Swiss-Prot record:
Catalytic activity of the protein: a 3-demethylubiquinol + S-adenosyl-L-methionine = a ubiquinol + S-adenosyl-L-homocysteine + H(+); a 3-(all-trans-polyprenyl)benzene-1,2-diol + S-adenosyl-L-methionine = a 2-methoxy-6-(all-trans-polyprenyl)phenol + S-adenosyl-L-homocysteine + H(+)
Function statement: O-methyltransferase that catalyzes the 2 O-methylation steps in the ubiquinone biosynthetic pathway.
Signal peptide coordinates: none
Keyword list, A-Z: Methyltransferase, S-adenosyl-L-methionine, Transferase, Ubiquinone biosynthesis
Listed NCBIfam families: UbiG
Species of provenance: Xylella fastidiosa (strain 9a5c)
Protein name listed in UniProt: Ubiquinone biosynthesis O-methyltransferase
Pfam family, one: Methyltransf_23
InterPro entries xref list: SAM-dependent_MTases_sf, UbiG_MeTrfase
MF annotations from Gene Ontology: 2-polyprenyl-6-hydroxyphenol methylase activity; 3-demethylubiquinol 3-O-methyltransferase activity; polyprenyldihydroxybenzoate methyltransferase activity
């Protein structure tokens, strides 16, 4: 891939970009290599829409991939900006947007560089299945916090660093059932909820909720659960601006 990435952001791994770029041909196939993501998408959308009125909202999708969540958010009336560092995936997302007629502002851009542009703040930011794939996830959380308007919400989904997660998300999904290619996930990069909570606090955000999310491959179905030992969703809110004093 182009060395232009070095001019954009250092907070990426080339191997991760190459890995997900290889999924382009079947990204929008609900029975293809991204089948689990298709099952998770309605759960993620419902989790967000219950906490943010999406119609007319400004929403940022960080690490948008081929645009599954981006389009779903836009269908709910949100004005969506979606960023990813993989040109191949942004191309897939744009082409599918042309086919579906759904308007999303797709960009090959790092969140640090979007922050440098000082855009209007966002009502909501989604960072789904992304933090476990970058060298410095805390920096992503911090950049997200700076891009939220007061009262705006950050939504994160990731994988807990537990034995259960290793057995199911790595051994089971990649080696036994083979839902995902081998090497998709690295156990050492999984994130415990307490670690995420610390990054959110450091960024000035208040953690509102943590909910488990479970994918059932035998049914190809996903659902929320009280158990956060494997996949989980989190919502954090930016503090309201202090009232002006006379």
């Amino acid at each position: 891939m182009s060395s232009a990435y070095d001019r954009v952001s250092k907070n990426y791994r080339q191997s991760e970009l190459d890995k997900f770029a290889a999924f382009t041909s079947g990204w929008w196939d609900p029975h293809g290599p991204q089948k689990p993501l298709h099952a998770l998408n309605p759960v993620r959308l419902d989790y967000i829409s219950k906490r943010v009125p999406l119609s007319g909202a400004r929403v940022l999708d960080v690490g948008c991939g081929g645009g599954l969540l981006s389009e779903a958010l836009a269908r709910q009336g949100a004005h969506v900006t979606a960023i990813d560092l993989a040109p191949e995936l942004i191309k897939v997302a744009r082409l599918h947007g042309l086919e579906s007629g759904i308007q999303v502002d797709y960009r090959i851009q790092a969140i640090e560089d979007l922050l440098a542009e000082q855009p209007a703040p966002f009502d909501a930011i989604a960072c789904m299945e992304m933090l476990e794939h970058v060298p410095d996830p805390a920096a992503i959380v911090d950049a997200c916090a700076h891009l939220l308007k007061p009262g705006g919400r950050l939504f994160v989904s990731t994988i807990n660093r537990t034995l259960a997660a290793f057995m199911l998300a790595v051994v089971g999904a990649e080696y036994v059932v083979r839902l995902l290619p081998k090497g998709t996930h690295q156990y050492k990069d999984f994130i415990r909820p307490a670690e995420l909570a610390a990054w959110l606090r450091h960024a000035g955000l208040h953690l509102e909720d943590v909910s488990g999310m479970r994918y059932e491959p035998w049914r190809n179905r996903a659902r929320l659960t009280d158990r956060t030992d494997i996949n989980y969703l989190a919502c954090a809110i930016s503090p309201e601006a202090p009232h002006a004093t006379e």
